[in-house]
From Swiss-Prot:
Cleaved near the N-terminus by the viral protease during virion maturation to form the mature protein. Residues 34-52 have a biased composition (Basic residues). GO terms for biological process: symbiont entry into host cell; viral penetration into host nucleus. The modification N-acetylserine is found at residue 2. The modification N6-acetyllysine is found at residues 27, 48. This is Pre-histone-like nucleoprotein. The keyword Acetylation applies. Belongs to the adenoviridae histone-like nucleoprotein family. A motif (Nuclear localization signal) lies at residues 188-198. Induction: Expressed in the late phase of the viral replicative cycle. Pfam families: Adeno_VII (PF03228).
Length: 198
C-alpha cells in the first residue's frame, strides 16, 4: 500500500515536481524533513468550517417558532343579534311546517257532501275495515241488493260516484279493490279478496 506524502493538499505524488517531495528542497536533509503524518486528511466532520455554537438569538427564534406552531386562534365573539335572528327563523320554519301538516291532515279528513251512493260506499268501506273480508263481501251484497230499484241512468251515475269515492278513500291504504259482478243483481261490487279464476 502506497503512502501519499505530497504536501500540495493530496493532489499528486510529486513525481513530476521533485521539489514538492521534501517540503520545497531538492533532496532530503535534516533541515527539510518529510512530515508524513501531517498530510493525512482528518475524518469527516472533524473540522467545523464556519459553524458556530448556538446563541441566545437561536433560542429566541426557536421559541417563536414553537409558539407559532402551537397557536390556536381564539373563537370570534358570539353575536346575540345573530342568535336572536336564528331563533326567530327556526320558530317560523317550525310554525310553517306545523301549519302545512295541519292543512294536509285537514285536507285528508275533509268531508265532502256526497250522494247516497257515495255515503253507502263510505259506510261499506268503514264496515269492511272493522269487520274483515267476509263481512265486506256480505256488506257489498247487501248494498248491491239495495241498489236494484235505482233507475238505469241513475244506477250508472251512482256506480261511478261510488267507484270514485272508493278509489279516493283507498289511495292511502295498501291492498287492491276488485270489482266483481254480483250474481243476484248483476251489478259490479267492490271486494278486497281476489275472485277465483274460472
Amino acid at each position: 500500500m502506497s503512502i501519499l506524502i505530497s504536501p500540495s493538499n493530496n493532489t499528486g505524488w510529486g513525481l513530476r515536481f521533485p521539489s514538492k517531495m521534501f517540503g520545497g528542497a531538492k533532496k532530503r536533509s535534516d533541515q527539510h524533513p518529510v512530515r508524513v503524518r501531517g498530510h493525512y486528511r482528518a475524518p469527516w466532520g472533524a473540522h467545523k468550517r464556519g459553524r458556530t455554537g448556538r446563541t441566545t438569538v437561536d433560542d429566541a427564534i426557536d421559541a417563536v417558532v414553537e409558539e407559532a406552531r402551537n397557536y390556536t386562534p381564539t373563537p370570534p365573539p358570539v353575536s346575540t343579534v345573530d342568535a336572536a335572528i336564528q331563533t326567530v327563523v327556526r320558530g317560523a320554519r317550525r310554525y310553517a311546517k306545523m301549519k302545512r301538516r295541519r292543512r294536509r291532515v285537514a285536507r285528508r279528513h275533509r268531508r265532502r257532501p256526497g250522494t247516497a251512493a257515495q255515503r253507502a260506499a263510505a259506510a261499506l268501506l268503514n264496515r269492511a275495515r272493522r269487520t274483515g273480508r267476509r263481512a265486506a263481501m256480505r256488506a257489498a251484497r247487501r248494498l248491491a241488493a239495495g241498489i236494484v230499484t235505482v233507475p238505469p241512468r241513475s244506477r250508472r251515475r251512482a256506480a261511478a260516484a261510488a267507484a270514485a269515492a272508493i278509489s279516493a278513500m283507498t289511495q292511502g291504504r295498501r291492498g287492491n279493490v276488485y270489482w266483481v259482478r254480483d250474481s243476484v243483481s248483476g251489478l259490479r261490487v267492490p271486494v278486497r279478496t281476489r275472485p277465483p279464476r274460472n
